Amino acid sequence: MQREEKQLEASLDALLSQVADLKNSLGSFICKLENEYGRLTWPSVLDSFALLSGQLNTLNKVLKHEKTPLFRNQVIIPLVLSPDRDEDLMRQTEGRVPVFSHEVVPDHLRTKPDPEVEEQEKQLTTDAARIGADAAQKQIQSLNKMCSNLLEKISKEERESESGGLRPNKQTFNPTDTNALVAAVAFGKGLSNWRPSGSSGPGQAGQPGAGTILAGTSGLQQVQMAGAPSQQQPMLSGVQMAQAGQPGKMPSGIKTNIKSASMHPYQR
C-alpha cells in the first residue's frame, strides 16, 4: 500500500512539473500576444506553438507511461465545504479559486461534461452511426481529394511568388530599338531621302528632286502670269493633270517649260 502511495505521489509530482512548464509557456505566449502584437512575427508565433505542442506531447507520454497509475481509478472527495475565503486555496490556485463552496465543487470536480454538451455528443454519435461505411469512405476520399487540390494550389502559388521575388522581371523590349524608333518618328533621325528610279529625265540630271520641280513649276506660273495672262489656265491644267496622274513623273512638255523658265531673267 505504501509503495502504491509513493508511486502515486511521484507520478503526481512529475505531472505537476509538466503542467507548470506548460502553464508558463502559455502565460508567456499570451503576454507576447497582448504586449508585442505590433512587432510580433509569424516565425516567433510558430515557435511558440511548436513549444506548446512539444510540452503537450510530453504530458501525454507521462500519463501513458506504464509506471504511472491510472488516475481515473482515484476518487476525490471534498471533506470540507465552506463559503468563507480560504487563503491557502487562493495561494494554491494562484487566486483563481477563492472559496471552496457548493457552487464551485461541481465545476472543479466534475468527471462528466455538462448535460448540454453530453446531449450534443450523443446526437453527433447517432448521426455518425446512421452513415454507412461505404458512404463514409466516399466522403472521406472526396474530402481528402479537395484538401490535396487545395494544398497543391497553395504550394504552387508559394513557389511562383518565391521565384518571382528571387529573379527580376524579364525585359520584353530593347531600349536601344525603342529610343531609335521614337527618334525616327519624332525627329526623323536616321531616315534617308529616297526616290524611285526613273523619276528624273535626261534634262533633269542636275535637279535634286520633285520638290525642286514643283518649285520651278510655281516660278514658271508666275512668269507666265506676268508675261502672257492668256496662257495661265492651260499651264495650270497641265500641272494639275501631271500631279493627279503620275506624282513621280512629269510630262516632257512641262520639263521644257521649266527649262525655259529657268532661263528667264527674273529667275536669276
From Swiss-Prot:
Phosphoserine occurs at: S82
The main location class comes to nucleus
Output the Gene Ontology terms for molecular function: RNA polymerase II cis-regulatory region sequence-specific DNA binding; transcription coregulator activity; ubiquitin protein ligase activity
Where is the segment annotated Disordered?
156-176, 193-268
The reported result of mutating C147F is: Impairs interaction with the Elongin BC complex
**Pathway(s):** Protein modification; protein ubiquitination
Region (Interaction with the Elongin BC complex) location? 142-151
Segments forming a coiled coil: 1-28, 133-163
State where composition is biased (Polar residues). 218-235
Is-annotated flag, keyword DNA damage? no
What GO biological process terms are annotated to this protein in UniProt?
positive regulation of transcription elongation by RNA polymerase II; positive regulation of transcription initiation by RNA polymerase II; protein ubiquitination; regulation of transcription by RNA polymerase II; RNA polymerase II preinitiation complex assembly
Q: Where in the cell is it found?
A: Nucleus
Per the record, GO CC terms? core mediator complex; mediator complex; nucleoplasm; nucleus; ubiquitin ligase complex
Gly residues composition bias: residue spans: 200-209
Key word Transcription present = yes
Query: Which keywords has UniProt assigned to this entry?
Result: Activator, Coiled coil, Nucleus, Phosphoprotein, Transcription, Transcription regulation, Ubl conjugation pathway
Disulfide bridge positions per record:
none
InterPro entries in the record: Mediatior_Med8_fun/met
User: What is the annotated role of this protein in its UniProt record?
Assistant: Component of the Mediator complex, a coactivator involved in the regulated transcription of nearly all RNA polymerase II-dependent genes. Mediator functions as a bridge to convey information from gene-specific regulatory proteins to the basal RNA polymerase II transcription machinery. Mediator is recruited to promoters by direct interactions with regulatory proteins and serves as a scaffold for the assembly of a functional preinitiation complex with RNA polymerase II and the general transcription factors.
Whom does it interact with, and what assembly results?
Answer: Component of the Mediator complex, which is composed of MED1, MED4, MED6, MED7, MED8, MED9, MED10, MED11, MED12, MED13, MED13L, MED14, MED15, MED16, MED17, MED18, MED19, MED20, MED21, MED22, MED23, MED24, MED25, MED26, MED27, MED29, MED30, MED31, CCNC, CDK8 and CDC2L6/CDK11. The MED12, MED13, CCNC and CDK8 subunits form a distinct module termed the CDK8 module. Mediator containing the CDK8 module is less active than Mediator lacking this module in supporting transcriptional activation.
How does the record comment on the protein's domains? Answer: The elongin BC complex binding domain is also known as BC-box with the consensus [APST]-L-x(3)-C-x(3)-[AILV].
Family as reported in the entry's similarity comment: Belongs to the Mediator complex subunit 8 family.
| Record protein name field | Mediator of RNA polymerase II transcription subunit 8
- What organism is this sequence from? Homo sapiens (Human)
Name the lineage: Eukaryota, Metazoa, Chordata, Craniata, Vertebrata
